[in-house]
UniProtKB/Swiss-Prot annotation:
Gene Ontology BP annotations: queuosine biosynthetic process
Keywords: ATP-binding, Ligase, Metal-binding, Nucleotide-binding, Queuosine biosynthesis, Zinc
Known cofactor(s): Zn(2+)
Molecular function via GO: ATP binding; ligase activity, forming carbon-nitrogen bonds; zinc ion binding
Name assigned to this protein: 7-cyano-7-deazaguanine synthase
Enzyme class (EC, first level): ligase
């Protein structure tokens, strides 16, 4: 039996990953992390979606220690989430240092326990928000370290790594879940479901990708299929 664990926030990217994983694996588990995030409404959204989509199990792990260590606008109410700035340079204040290091490591431990062969994460390098822990180089390096440390080949899969947001919408549509991802996921840094606040970087990436996809579905769908190998 093929098993996978999805690092699941209830947002656009991880929900799209879950939708695909359910088609590719016999048994899919979801792991969601409570780190005291500003947008912690995502935890309830993740619970609802994991149940609705048919995950075998959904584990919510308390990692609030991260909130004490990692200073970010997503972990401190006193630091405002900035509006999207297209010309901004450097790492944004929404970056939570160590978050994906912790999440992927804990997800791998869970995968070890449930005998899953893969940990799936929705990180992406093509239009990411400037986070160093969304890079392919990082994921591969951590995957190597974790596999060595556990003496077990647990594969980190990144199905969205080389597709952009428009193509991620196309992937959701490919599996017949475009409306669900648009209306029932939570991507917004300010914790607003669906189309979100419309001002933060997460909402901007999501909206621009959707508009691009809806404006030229055939071209974007074809590009997504070519990059992912789907028919």
């Amino acid at each position: 039996m093929k098993r996978a664990v999805v690092v699941f926030s209830g947002g656009q990217d991880s929900t799209t990953c879950l939708v695909q994983a359910l088609q590719q694996y016999d048994e899919v588990h979801c792991v969601t992390f409570d780190y005291g995030q500003r947008h912690r409404a995502e935890i309830d959204v993740a619970r609802e979606l994991a149940l609705k989509l048919g995950a075998r199990a959904h584990k919510v792990l308390d990692v609030t220690l991260l909130n004490e260590l990692a200073v970010s606008s997503l972990t401190r109410d006193s630091i405002p989430v900035p509006d999207y700035e297209p010309e901004a340079d450097g790492i944004p204040n929404t970056f939570v240092p160590g978050r994906n290091i912790l999440f992927l490591t804990l997800a791998a431990i869970y995968a070890y326990q449930v005998k899953a062969e893969a940990v799936i994460t929705g990180v992406c390098e093509t239009d990411f928000s400037g986070y160093p822990d969304c890079r392919d180089e990082f994921v591969k390096a951590l995957n190597h370290a974790v596999s060595l440390g556990m003496a077990k080949d647990i594969r980190f899969e990144t199905p969205l790594m080389w597709i952009d947001k428009a193509e991620t919408w196309a992937l959701a549509d490919y599996y017949g879940k475009l409306d669900l991802v648009r209306n029932e996921t939570l991507t917004c840094y300010n914790g607003i479901k669906g189309d979100g606040c419309g001002h933060c970087a997460a909402c901007n990436l999501r909206a621009n990708g959707l508009n691009h996809y809806l404006a030229d579905k055939p071209t974007v769908m074809a590009a997504m299929k070519q990059k992912t190998g789907l028919n």
